[in-house]
Curated annotation (Swiss-Prot):
Its cofactor is Zn(2+). This is Uncharacterized protein C216.04c. InterPro entries: Met_Sox_Rdtase_MsrB, Met_Sox_Rdtase_MsrB_dom, Mss4-like_sf. It comes from Schizosaccharomyces pombe (strain 972 / ATCC 24843) (Fission yeast). Zn(2+) binds at C49, C52, C97, C100. Its main location: cytoplasm.
Length: 138
């Protein structure tokens, strides 16, 4: 599956380091509650892809889901690609960066959260970086 930014797996390994590589390129996950952004709720700013720095989520879309991972109810338009994921005998929707294809987490719908989209983007902290202000240097 092609993405605008493509690199070899060796390049990703060098750039990301072992833990981010495991999560972002091998579709791993963090332990619940272990991520640095799980309990942080900035009022403004943006979350970007840890691999390619593409803008992904506005801080204003982050909410407390009590699931153990950062949760967002919507991504910036066109920035997160949804891919059907039937691994481990489950039907889920994988969230990946639309620019580099890095694994972010999964998207769930209809869980009863009172947010504008009725979605929970359950995202690994290791897949994100936070910027206090919106930037155009992605």
């Amino acid at each position: 599956m092609g993405f605008p930014l493509e690199k070899s797996e060796d390049e990703w390994k060098k750039e990301l380091g072992p833990e981010k590589y495991r999560i972002m390129r091998q579709k791993g996950t963090e332990h619940p509650g272990a991520g640095r952004f799980t309990h942080q709720f900035p009022k403004q700013g943006v979350f970007v892809c840890a691999a390619c720095k593409e803008l992904l989520y506005k801080a204003s879309t982050k909410f407390e889901s009590h699931c153990g991972w950062p949760a967002f109810f919507d991504n910036l338009p066109g920035k997160v690609k949804r891919i059907e994921d039937n691994s481990y005998g489950m039907h889920r929707v994988e969230a990946v960066c639309a620019n580099c294809g890095g694994h972010l987490g999964h998207i769930f719908k209809g869980e009863g959260y009172s947010n504008p989209t009725d979605e929970r983007h359950c995202i690994n902290s290791a897949s994100l970086e936070f910027h206090n202000e919106a930037t155009n240097d992605n």
